[in-house]
Curated annotation (Swiss-Prot):
Function: Specific class of high-redox-potential 4Fe-4S ferredoxins. Functions in anaerobic electron transport in most purple and in some other photosynthetic bacteria and in at least one genus (Paracoccus) of halophilic, denitrifying bacteria.
Family statement: Belongs to the high-potential iron-sulfur protein (HiPIP) family.
Subunit and interaction comment: Homodimer.
Protein's name in the database: High-potential iron-sulfur protein isozyme 2
A GO biological-process term: aerobic electron transport chain
GO-annotated molecular function: 4 iron, 4 sulfur cluster binding; electron transfer activity; metal ion binding
Keyword Transport: yes
Pfam families linked: HIPIP (PF01355)
Keywords, comma-separated and alphabetical: 4Fe-4S, Electron transport, Iron, Iron-sulfur, Metal-binding, Transport
Amino acids binding [4Fe-4S] cluster: C34, C37, C51, C65
InterPro entries: High_potential_FeS_prot, HIPIP_sf
Lineage: Bacteria, Pseudomonadati, Pseudomonadota, Gammaproteobacteria, Chromatiales
Length: 71
């Protein structure tokens, strides 16, 4: 499966970033990452894993987007 690019239109629409520590968004709270998001569908995937928001793409476990939901 292909990794999601930050330049992908869907990624840009949800302000996805590979590295949550670089996020400058008012909704972001420290500690939120794809790995601890409910939408990250394989919590055992510690580097890159699937996300239900971006079908067919892998997101960084350390990433973040505006669709983040607590696991």
């Amino acid at each position: 499966m292909e990794r999601l690019s930050e330049d992908d239109p869907a990624a840009q629409a949800l302000e996805y970033r590979h590295d949550a520590s670089s996020v400058q968004h008012p909704a972001y709270e420290e500690g939120q990452t794809c790995l601890n998001c409910l939408l990250y569908t394989d919590a055992s995937a510690q580097d890159w894993g699937p996300c239900s928001v971006f079908p067919g793409k892998l997101v960084s476990a350390n990433g973040w987007c505006t669709a983040w939901v607590a696991r």
